[in-house]
């Protein structure tokens, strides 16, 4: 139903900017590009084209499942190990609740760590051979990011590579069809042995990993992805079509078409109860 959407943003809920923001800016290389008065700010890695919108939800914000995380790419396996050791050293300084052990998972060599806002984050590396299986495993950047930003850390975050979603284990194939046929996103060819699937837009290398789960913890709209389509006219038409056919394609919630600061958008909740924002250029 959506035609050639572009994945332009991820959205991320934390408890306090004061606690979470230093993790992003000092450990992951993110930069704040916009600040809003409604409890959100927009960050971007200089080497990556999409943004991450951070929502400050207060002390009651829940811990998010591990498989609702975002991941950053480094340039070597040794950098993954070095990053892990560095984060262990600064764990108390940044109030990191945990720093995991590097391991191989879904072809990536990576580790997870927690941040004080209730979320998990990943640092990963893919061997060059992996890029032969899928382009998403190759570098997402045109040139390496400047090392001085990470001086003394032993690693350099080259870019924000992916986000993640969950779906019900029993609904994996219907959800794949929804992503492709309704949201208009591409399904990345992957080795058949992987239990997950990847979705992305037609224009950019970053992607979203969908992880089937037996037990789910459903999140609110502060944890969502933003898809941008061609025009406001196309946005109105898409909203009308979803309103007419939403039950047929198993949409669980459809928000009103809104305009805010000259920007038009609407929210929808998909069959897996994940949230999306659909918008158009101003």
Model-derived regions: residue spans:
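Residues that act as N-cap/strand-start positions at coil-to-secondary-structure junctions
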Residues: 37, 105-107, 193, 221, ...
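Conserved donor-binding loop and adjoining core beta-sheet/short helix segment
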Residues: 54-61, 211-215
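Vicinal oxygen chelate
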Residues: 6-15, 44, 61-156, 240-282, ...
């Amino acid at each position: 139903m959506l035609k050639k959407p572009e994945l332009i943003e991820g959205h991320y809920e934390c408890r306090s900017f004061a606690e979470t923001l230093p993790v992003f800016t000092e450990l992951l290389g993110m930069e704040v590009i916009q600040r809003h008065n409604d409890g959100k700010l927009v960050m971007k890695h200089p080497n990556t084209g999409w943004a991450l919108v951070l929502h400050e939800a207060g002390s009651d914000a829940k811990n998010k499942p591990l498989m609702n995380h975002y991941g950053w790419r480094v340039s070597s396996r040794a950098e993954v190990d070095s990053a892990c050791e560095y984060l262990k050293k600064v764990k108390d300084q940044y109030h990191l609740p945990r720093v995991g052990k590097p391991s191989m998972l879904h072809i990536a060599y990576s580790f997870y760590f927690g941040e004080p806002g209730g979320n998990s984050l990943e640092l990963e590396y893919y061997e060059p051979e992996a890029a032969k299986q899928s382009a998403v495993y190759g570098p997402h950047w045109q040139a390496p990011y400047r090392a001085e930003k990470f001086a003394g850390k032993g690693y350099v975050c080259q870019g924000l590579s992916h986000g993640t979603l969950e779906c019900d284990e029993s609904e994996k194939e219907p959800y794949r069809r929804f992503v492709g046929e309704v949201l208009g996103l591409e399904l990345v060819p992957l080795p058949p042995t992987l239990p997950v699937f990847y979705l992305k837009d037609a224009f950019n290398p970053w992607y979203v990993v969908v992880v089937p789960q037996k037990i789910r913890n459903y999140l609110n709209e502060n944890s969502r992805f933003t898809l941008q389509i061609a025009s406001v006219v196309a946005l109105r038409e898409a909203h009308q079509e979803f309103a007419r056919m939403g039950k047929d394609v198993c949409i669980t919630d459809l928000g009103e078409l809104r305009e805010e600061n000259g920007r038009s958008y609407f929210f929808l909740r998909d069959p897996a109860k994940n949230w999306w924002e659909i918008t158009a250029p101003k």
